[in-house]
């Protein structure tokens, strides 16, 4: 046994340290640039048709293909939003051929999407198209670009969105990992709930690229990446300075501006810098003015230190304040006490976040590169709300205050190397990093008014550290077949200083978890890819709870399998589908409004996803996503094993009409079916279908737009929960649906000037 272990260890070391074996074939060293200058274009797909060999450009716009037999080949370069290029390249024995190409922007076309490149590009291309073709004006719109993702807002825009994905009520982020340029959005051990992910500091016009994934299959995604993950990349280059203004019903105003700090004539220099700012205000459609306001700012500087080194620094932040009408019980509306847009008890809140993120990317040689980022965030949050009214305190009411004040810092680093073992191409990625959160005075209190604390339910300092490392190996068994395997290890250190103890002191606990993952990807042809993924993941639990528990219950595992395919039946149609299953060992649900943890036992979710993107004609583009999930608790008897708010059927889609190169309109819909609001399905959260209409007229220097939300003025509930409440003077509590009404008919107009 000892000899076997030694051999396995030696093989492992060999896989990491093996270098490319020399061959007598030729190779291609290429660069792809954006436009006339020498700004690299990342994510362009390279494909040699005759021999079915592919690559994708890195952050330097470079790619390297080796072991190419001698001869002439047709090389195809494509990228969403750019004109596809086809050229003939000659490969000579023992010679590295230099290849440089400049790509120019063009209308978005399905035929630019390739399924011959690496799997990440293929699976993220659908949202890449959507990012180019759909109007995006808020972080809500950005999240809706993820196929199957549903969101709801129940604080007028102030709180993080409630998310639904693959049968998960993700709440504000328990099972979806969000990040921007390598910086996490989710907040661990947050006062309002574990994984709280407020993405409102993102200015939508700054987003250059969106990647996403469903399931716990990515090695570099750790905590919260069980149902899925979303990663945004901001622009390095602002092509045009611009000013944009929007105005609409209910006192809605939005202004955003971006200024390129580098003169356009410096397009061939090695530096880029821009600043962007945004302001939002609305009273919203509720009976009581919501007084929502938010200010965002972003500054980013990028220096191409050399052909092989990129350094980027971004500073961003936002500050927001609001009033809210809160969730209201259906019986109050039915009795005529309030309207659908009324209130029982006023709510209010404020929050801010300021970030610094330093990114470094170095290409070590044609076969390997190193990338890293260091981030620092200052965050605060204060929320007054009342979900149960007079259930617990019939005199003062049940208003609670939640407060969070923290500093978060972290570092991510990875080294990637491409080499060969004999004639077998191999790609290795080794990553490591840490995250540290220091929260001062995390608070949940029963309050009266804005200043009187009646009772503190949770109050203390939190320190949480996450150390991690991962190894990811890809073996290119044939040009069409890739096997990927690896593992990730996460180690958590939880410290809680409970001020409510008679003798306050730090209580600590530690836990670690391995998360192995594997996948097999097969390109059947130029137009079809099949894949199988297996992965383990986890979501950590609140430090205030796990500090007093054994390590077995801190990081419950998630096990998941996906079997899927991506098809292009012909050049204008892109289809993707997947059948999947995900098991959770235990669903710890932190109820931030009550300061308790509700372990709901093991669960299983099974379902399928279907997405379609279709360029029907030059003037008509169709897109649709359909998602089905069956979610059940495994330790409960049939009939009482429903998972509250787990959506069974969701669908999003639309049609875009391009009348000419300047004018376009779009009609969109989103649908979510009825879903259980409690464990025995006796209370139903009603589904809805809502239609939106958009129109846009764009020229080189200016742009006009119109958007109508809820075109048919459908009555729908954006957020809804089965909640036990008691109104003033009610003799007994009542458990029923409490909801936040969805947007009624709403129209807004926009104008932009580019310079």
Model-derived regions: residue spans:
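Short strand-turn segments of transmembrane beta-barrel domains in outer membranes
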Residues: 211-219, 227-263, 285, 554, ...
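Membrane-embedded beta-barrel scaffold of Gram-negative outer-membrane proteins
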Residues: 359-361, 369-387, 523, 529-537, ...
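Face-selective signature of the C-terminal outer-membrane beta-barrel domain
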Residues: 304-318, 349-499, 523, 569, ...
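Short acidic/polar hinge/loop motifs at secondary-structure boundaries
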Residues: 66, 184-214, 232-233, 299, ...
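C-terminal beta-signal and adjacent terminal beta-strands/loops
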Residues: 622, 674-678, 697-755
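Gram-negative outer-membrane beta-barrel transporters
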Residues: 415, 580-583, 599-679, 750-754
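Structural signature of Gram-negative outer-membrane beta-barrels, strongest in the C-terminal barrel
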Residues: 424-429, 433-435, 460-584, 627-630, ...
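Transmembrane beta-barrel wall of Gram-negative outer-membrane proteins
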Residues: 27, 247-281, 286-325, 348-365, ...
């Amino acid at each position: 046994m000892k000899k076997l272990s030694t051999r396995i260890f030696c093989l492992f070391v060999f896989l990491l340290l093996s270098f490319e074996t020399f061959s007598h074939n030729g190779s291609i060293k290429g660069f792809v640039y954006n436009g006339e200058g020498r700004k690299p274009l990342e994510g362009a797909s390279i494909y040699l048709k005759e021999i079915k060999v592919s690559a994708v450009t890195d952050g330097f716009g470079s790619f390297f293909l080796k072991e190419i037999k001698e001869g002439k080949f047709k090389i195809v370069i494509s990228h969403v939003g750019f004109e596809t290029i086809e050229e003939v390249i000659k490969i000579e024995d023992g010679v590295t051929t230099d290849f440089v190409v400049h790509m120019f922007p063009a209308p978005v076309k399905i035929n630019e999407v390739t399924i011959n490149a690496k799997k990440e590009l293929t699976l993220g291309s659908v949202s890449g198209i959507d990012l180019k073709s759909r109007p995006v004006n808020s972080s809500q719109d950005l999240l809706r670009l993820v196929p199957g993702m549903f969101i709801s807002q129940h604080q007028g825009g102030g709180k993080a969105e409630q998310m639904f994905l693959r049968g998960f009520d993700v709440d504000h982020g328990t099972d979806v990992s969000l990040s921007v340029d390598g910086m996490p959005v989710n907040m661990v051990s947050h006062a309002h709930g574990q994984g709280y992910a407020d993405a409102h500091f993102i200015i939508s016009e700054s987003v250059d690229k969106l990647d996403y994934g469903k399931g716990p299959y990515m090695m570099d995604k750790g905590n919260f990446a069980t149902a899925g993950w979303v990663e945004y990349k901001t622009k390095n280059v602002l092509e045009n300075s611009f000013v944009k203004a929007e105005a609409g019903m209910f006192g809605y105003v939005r202004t955003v501006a971006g200024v390129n700090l580098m003169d356009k004539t410096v397009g061939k220099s090695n530096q880029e810098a821009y600043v962007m700012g945004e302001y939002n205000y609305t009273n919203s459609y509720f009976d009581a003015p919501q007084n929502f306001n938010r200010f965002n700012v972003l500054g980013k500087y990028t220096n191409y230190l050399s052909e092989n080194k990129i350094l980027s620094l971004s500073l961003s932040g936002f500050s927001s304040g609001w009033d809210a009408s809160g969730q209201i019980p259906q019986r109050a509306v039915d009795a005529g006490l309030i309207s659908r847009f009324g209130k029982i008890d006023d709510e209010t809140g404020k929050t801010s976040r300021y970030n610094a993120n330093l990114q470094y990317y170095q290409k070590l040689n044609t076969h390997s590169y190193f990338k890293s980022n260091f981030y620092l965030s200052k965050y605060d949050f204060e929320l007054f709300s009342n979900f149960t009214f007079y259930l617990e305190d019939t005199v003062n009411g049940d208003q609670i205050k939640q407060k969070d004040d923290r500093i978060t810092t972290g570092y991510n680093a990875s080294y990637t190397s491409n080499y060969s073992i004999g004639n077998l191409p191999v790609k290795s990625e080794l990553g490591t990093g840490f995250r540290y959160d220091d929260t001062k005075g995390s608070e949940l209190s029963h309050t009266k008014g804005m200043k009187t604390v009646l009772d503190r339910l949770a109050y203390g300092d939190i320190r949480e550290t996450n150390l991690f490392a991962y190894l990811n190996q890809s073996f290119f068994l044939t040009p069409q077949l890739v096997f990927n395997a690896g593992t990730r290890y996460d180690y958590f250190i939880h410290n809680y200083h409970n001020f409510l103890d008679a003798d306050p002191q730090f209580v600590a606990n530690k836990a670690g978890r391995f998360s192995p993952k594997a996948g097999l990807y097969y390109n059947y042809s130029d137009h079809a890819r099949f894949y199988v993924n297996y992965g383990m993941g986890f979501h950590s639990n609140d430090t205030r709870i796990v500090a007093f528990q054994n390590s077995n219950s801190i990081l419950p595992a998630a096990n998941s399998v996906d079997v899927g395919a991506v098809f292009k039946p012909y050049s204008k149609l892109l289809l993707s589908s997947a059948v999947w299953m995900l098991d959770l060992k235990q669903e710890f649900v932190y109820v931030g409004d009550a300061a308790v943890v509700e372990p709901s036992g093991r669960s299983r979710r099974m379902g399928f996803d279907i997405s379609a993107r279709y360029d029907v004609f030059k003037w008509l583009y169709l897109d649709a996503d359909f998602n089905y999930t069956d979610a059940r608790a495994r330790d409960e008897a049939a009939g009482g094993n429903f998972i509250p708010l787990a959506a069974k059927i969701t669908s999003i889609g639309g049609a875009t009409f391009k009348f000419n190169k300047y004018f376009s309109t779009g009609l969109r819909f989103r649908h979510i079916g009825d879903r259980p609001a409690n464990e025995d399905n006796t209370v139903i959260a009603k589904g809805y279908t809502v239609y939106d209409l958009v129109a846009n007229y764009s020229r080189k220097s200016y742009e006009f737009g119109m958007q109508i939300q809820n075109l048919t003025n459908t009555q729908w509930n954006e957020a809804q929960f089965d909640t036990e409440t008691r109104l003033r003077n009610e003799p007994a509590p009542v458990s029923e649906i409490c909801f936040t009404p969805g947007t009624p008919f709403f129209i807004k107009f926009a104008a932009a000037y580019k310079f």
